[in-house]
């Protein structure tokens, strides 16, 4: 059974939205701490880039 590219992108979006909601519920880190938390905007930009690569390879413009 082949998994379509659209279902992979939807699965990635669901996972990222769950992670982003978990991060938004967590308390904010101290300004002096060196935490390397990934912002939800960076994650969504990464998803957009991956989706462009996945669907861009199928499109011939």
Swiss-Prot record:
* Residues that bear 4-hydroxyproline: 27, 29, 31
What membrane topology does the UniProt entry give? Lipid-anchor; GPI-anchor
The protein's location, in the record's own words, is:
Cell membrane
Lipid attachment locations (GPI-anchor amidated serine) = 35
- Where does it primarily localize? membrane
Give the domain of life.
Answer: Eukaryota
Entry PTM: Contains 4-hydroxyproline; hydroxylated on Pro-27, Pro-29 and Pro-31. O-glycosylated on hydroxyprolines; noncontiguous hydroxylproline residues are glycosylated with arabinogalactan.
Q: Which UniProt keywords apply?
A: Cell membrane, Glycoprotein, GPI-anchor, Hydroxylation, Lipoprotein, Membrane, Proteoglycan, Pyrrolidone carboxylic acid, Signal
Where does the UniProt annotation place the signal sequence? 1-22
Q: What Gene Ontology cellular component terms go with this record?
A: plasma membrane; side of membrane
Which tissues carry this protein?
Expressed in reproductive tissues. Expressed in chalaza, funiculus, stigma, septum, style, integument and transmitting tract.
Q: Which residues are glycosylated?
A: 27, 29, 31
Q: Which residues form the propeptide?
A: 36-61
Task: State the family it belongs to.
Answer: Belongs to the AG-peptide AGP family.
Function, as annotated: Proteoglycan that seems to be implicated in diverse developmental roles such as differentiation, cell-cell recognition, embryogenesis and programmed cell death.
Protein name from the UniProt record: Arabinogalactan protein 15
């Amino acid at each position: 059974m082949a998994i379509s590219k659209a279902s992979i992108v939807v699965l990635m979006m669901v996972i990222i939205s769950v992670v982003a909601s978990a991060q938004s519920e967590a308390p904010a880190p101290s300004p002096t701490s060196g935490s390397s938390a990934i912002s939800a905007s960076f994650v969504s930009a990464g998803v957009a880039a991956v989706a462009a690569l996945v669907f861009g390879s199928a499109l011939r413009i």
